[in-house]
C-alpha cells in the first residue's frame, strides 16, 4: 500500500493480499517447483479476484475502473487480469512481471494503458521476460510503455518516480 500511496497520493486504494500461503508471505497463485507459473491455477484464481475487485469497487462507491499496481507475483496476476478480464481495469503498472500465460490474450485491450518496469539485474527473472509480456499485450492492442532499469528485483525510488509520472500523464 505504501507504493500505491507514493504513485497516486490522493487516489482511493484497495490493498489485496494473495490467498496462497507461501510461508512466509502470500501469493496470488501457485508456482511449480521450478518457479514457473502454474497457469491452470492462475486461470482459476484470476476470475475470482476480478469478482472481488468489482464487488469491492461497488461496495466502496468507486465509480472509475481501477488501475492495478502489481509487483512480482502481483504484477503477474495483474497481467492475467488484463488478459482474461479486459473490462475490469483502466490500466496497470507492472513492476518485475513475467508472462502469466504462454498463449496469446483471448481478448482485445484496445488502448488500455500498461506500464511495465523491468530490472536489468533481476536474478528472479530471465532477461527479456518483461519485453515478452510487453509484446504480447501490444499484440492484443494495449498501449504499453516499457522501462528497463539498472536494478534488481526490489522496487526502487526510480520505479516509483516512473510510475507516478506515468499516472500523471494518463490522468486516469
Label the predicted regions.
Residues 1-64:
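Serine-hydrolase catalytic machinery in alpha/beta-hydrolase-like enzymes
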Residues 17, 69, 95-96, 117, ...:
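Alpha/beta-hydrolase-fold catalytic nucleophile elbow
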Residues 115-118, 122:
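Short beta-strand/loop motif that positions the catalytic acidic residue
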Amino acid at each position: 500500500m505504501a507504493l500505491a500511496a507514493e504513485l497516486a497520493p490522493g487516489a482511493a486504494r484497495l490493498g489485496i493480499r494473495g490467498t496462497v500461503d507461501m510461508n512466509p508471505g502470500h501469493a496470488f497463485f501457485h508456482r511449480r517447483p521450478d518457479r514457473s507459473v502454474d497457469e491452470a491455477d492462475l486461470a482459476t484464481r484470476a476470475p475470482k479476484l476480478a469478482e472481488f475487485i468489482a464487488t469491492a469497487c461497488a461496495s466502496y462507491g468507486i465509480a472509475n475502473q481501477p488501475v492495478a499496481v502489481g509487483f512480482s507475483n502481483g504484477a503477474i496476476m495483474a497481467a492475467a487480469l488484463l488478459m482474461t478480464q479486459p473490462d475490469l481495469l483502466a490500466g496497470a503498472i507492472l513492476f518485475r512481471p513475467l508472462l502469466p500465460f504462454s498463449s496469446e490474450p483471448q481478448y482485445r485491450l484496445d488502448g488500455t494503458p500498461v506500464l511495465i518496469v523491468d530490472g536489468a539485474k533481476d536474478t528472479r527473472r530471465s532477461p527479456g521476460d518483461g519485453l515478452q509480456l510487453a509484446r504480447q499485450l501490444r499484440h492484443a492492442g494495449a498501449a504499453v510503455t516499457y522501462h528497463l532499469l539498472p536494478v534488481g528485483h526490489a522496487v526502487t525510488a526510480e520505479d516509483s518516480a516512473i510510475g507516478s509520472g506515468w499516472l500523471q500523464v494518463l490522468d486516469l
